[in-house]
């Protein structure tokens, strides 16, 4: 079976997003397009042409409700599956992925954990009520984020800073693998949950990134707008402009042609004939 083209990957991911959107609407769960997908919605009214995945974010209370819903309705959601470390012990990330199991994904340099074509779901937690508090808070899990990345890698790679730094990196890699990704994911999640999303002025996906530019004012996320994305409409934060400028700067100007490449480095192919037939038709349903 042939690998999916970029456009076929986008079509498949869009179908997954439509399923997720239906669940969130039915259950009254807050979510919105995020990161590069949000740029795509504003700048291209769909995918960034060279992007190869979809990102959404959810306040932690809604994220928890989605996880509970997907576990309760596991059988009827098939072939869709929500991936977390508690649902799949081989899973290696503190975010969730809503995955179509009729496909198989193979990352370059990442351990195989049975992922299908997917949509990333980023849980948003509180970061504090002042800029100083939020900046300090978001830095705290940096070590655990690095350990999680060690657990996700399919093999050790020497330090890019030279051979003198490689032994220390190898020791950290071995220590992380000894404990396993679940240990660090549970620890970083317990840390992130200490600050209540609903009570903090600043929020962000602190289990995923430790940079200040991914921390936002909660008021920017409180209201959502529905905007065109490909052949459907999905919610985005009403404060999207300030958010995107905070993270990306001039997000409305595309990068130069030589930088217009996907960032995730994976291949996808259908495991089932039905999935393959969908892409032969070339239709977004």
Model-derived segments and their meaning:
Residues 1-25, 70-129, 148-249, 253-285:
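Conserved catalytic core of two-metal-ion nucleotidyltransferases
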Residues 45-47, 60, 143-144, 265-273:
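Charge-rich, low-complexity amphipathic helices
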Residues 138-141:
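Short, His- and charge-rich active-site/binding loops that engage polyanionic ligands
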Residues 21-54, 58-64, 219, 246-247:
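Active-site nucleotide-donor binding segment shared across nucleotidyl transfer reactions
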Residues 66-68:
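Conserved SAM-binding loop
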Residues 131-136:
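A short secondary-structure junction signal
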């Amino acid at each position: 079976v042939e690998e999916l083209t970029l456009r076929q990957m986008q079509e498949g991911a869009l179908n997954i997003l439509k399923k997720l959107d239906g669940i969130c609407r039915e259950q009254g769960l807050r979510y919105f397009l995020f990161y590069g997908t949000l740029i795509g919605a504003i700048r291209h009214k769909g995918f960034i042409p060279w992007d190869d995945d979809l990102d959404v974010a959810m306040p932690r209370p809604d994220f928890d409700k989605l996880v509970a819903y997907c576990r309760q309705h596991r059988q009827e959601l098939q072939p869709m599956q929500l991936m977390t470390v508690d649902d799949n012990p081989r899973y290696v990330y503190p975010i969730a992925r809503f995955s179509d199991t009729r496909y198989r994904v193979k990352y370059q340099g990442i351990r195989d954990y049975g992922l299908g074509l997917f949509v990333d779901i980023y849980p948003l937690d509180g970061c504090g009520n002042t800029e100083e508090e939020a900046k300090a808070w978001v830095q705290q899990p940096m070590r655990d984020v690095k350990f999680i990345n060690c657990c996700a890698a399919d093999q050790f790679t020497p330090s890019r800073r030279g051979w003198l730094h490689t032994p220390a990196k190898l020791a950290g890699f071995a220590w992380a693998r000894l404990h396993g990704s679940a240990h660090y994911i549970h620890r970083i999640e317990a840390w992130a949950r200490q600050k209540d999303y609903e009570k903090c002025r600043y929020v962000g996906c602190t289990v995923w990134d430790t940079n200040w530019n991914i921390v936002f004012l909660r008021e920017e996320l409180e209201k959502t707008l529905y905007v065109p994305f490909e052949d459907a409409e999905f919610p985005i934060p009403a404060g999207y402009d300030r958010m995107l400028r905070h993270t990306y700067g001039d997000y409305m100007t595309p990068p130069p042609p030589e930088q217009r490449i996907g960032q995730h480095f994976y291949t996808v192919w259908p495991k089932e004939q039905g999935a393959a037939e969908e892409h032969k038709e070339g239709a977004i349903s």
